């Protein structure tokens, strides 16, 4: 499929992550095919498309999560702050401190709410007790959770509701002060009220972070994102401003997917 239309979409904003000629393989399976994409800084970019199209695969390349699994490899350029992440000699943990990730299912650590936030910070910074207290409160406030948990910080993170757990995971992700936050279907396991709270939070987070979200929910992409990429069978079909892609798509494949004639 020709992806030149998608890859040449011009952005007015500064690019935070630049993807050029990216291919990805699960063993011999060619999962992503010559992806070209610019992720704008301090905006929300959504990846949409049917199951198996490569959305989550692309997301996990941005912090080299794929390296945790055998026989997976990426080829091409994924430039972040002027450096190709795929060939960087930096400690992967250092890369992930700059590119945080929140998964589909809430994954609080088996420890207190406080320690869930402090755990990652301790890996990269040596803060005294007072400064750590301030960082924990700051992260929980950023995740719109402080008011709900400030009196029970010593309770287990798993004691929270599903929506609260997901916001705890977001707080944990931003506590180390990354530059990019990756969200892999963060609302798929949540009820509508919790989903609304997370969507409000996403709108707030883009003031400080570059946010990339994978979602099966096209309405969510339309509500939350500034830019949207439509993917199909490992190809980037179309990329552009969310309003344009949803209301004036350039590709028939995109229009068919959005209007429900496909997928």
Curated annotation (Swiss-Prot):
GO biological process: phosphate ion transmembrane transport
Membrane-topology descriptor: Peripheral membrane protein
Domain ABC transporter: 17-258
Pfam families: ABC_tran (PF00005)
Keyword annotations of the record: ATP-binding, Cell inner membrane, Cell membrane, Membrane, Nucleotide-binding, Phosphate transport, Translocase, Transport
EC number assigned by the record: 7.3.2.1
Residues that coordinate or bind ATP: 49-56
Reactions catalysed according to its record: phosphate(out) + ATP + H2O = ADP + 2 phosphate(in) + H(+)
Compartmental location: Cell inner membrane
Transmembrane segments: none
CDD domains found in the cross-reference section: ABC_PstB_phosphate_transporter
Function: Part of the ABC transporter complex PstSACB involved in phosphate import. Responsible for energy coupling to the transport system.
Family stated for the protein in its record: Belongs to the ABC transporter superfamily. Phosphate importer (TC 3.A.1.7) family.
Name of the protein in question: Phosphate import ATP-binding protein PstB
Taxonomic source organism: Polaromonas sp. (strain JS666 / ATCC BAA-500)
Gene responsible for this protein: pstB
């Amino acid at each position: 499929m020709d992806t030149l239309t998608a890859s040449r979409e011009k952005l007015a904003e500064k690019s935070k992550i630049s993807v050029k000629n990216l291919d990805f393989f699960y063993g011999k399976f060619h999962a992503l095919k010559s992806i070209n994409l610019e992720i704008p800084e301090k905006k929300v970019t959504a990846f949409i498309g049917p199951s198996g199209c490569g959305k989550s695969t692309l997301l996990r390349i941005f912090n080299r999560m794929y390296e945790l699994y055998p026989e997976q490899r990426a080829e091409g350029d994924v430039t972040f702050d002027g450096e190709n992440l795929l060939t960087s000699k930096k400690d992967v943990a250092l890369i992930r401190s700059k590119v945080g990730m929140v998964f589909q299912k809430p994954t609080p650590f088996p420890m207190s709410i406080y320690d869930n936030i402090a755990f990652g910070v301790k890996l990269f910074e040596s803060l005294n007790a007072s400064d750590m207290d301030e960082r924990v409160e700051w992260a929980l406030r950023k995740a719109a959770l402080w008011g709900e948990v400030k009196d029970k910080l010593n309770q287990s993170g798993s004691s929270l509701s599903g929506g609260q757990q997901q916001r705890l995971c977001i707080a944990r992700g931003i506590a180390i002060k990354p530059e990019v936050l990756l969200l892999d279907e963060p609302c798929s396991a949540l009820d509508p009220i919790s989903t609304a709270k997370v969507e409000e939070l996403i709108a707030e987070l883009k003031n400080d972070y570059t946010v990339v979200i994978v979602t099966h929910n096209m309405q969510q992409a339309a509500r939350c994102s500034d830019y949207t990429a439509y993917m199909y069978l490992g190809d980037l079909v179309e990329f552009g401003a969310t309003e344009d892609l949803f209301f004036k798509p350039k590709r028939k494949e995109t229009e068919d997917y959005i209007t429900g004639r496909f997928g």
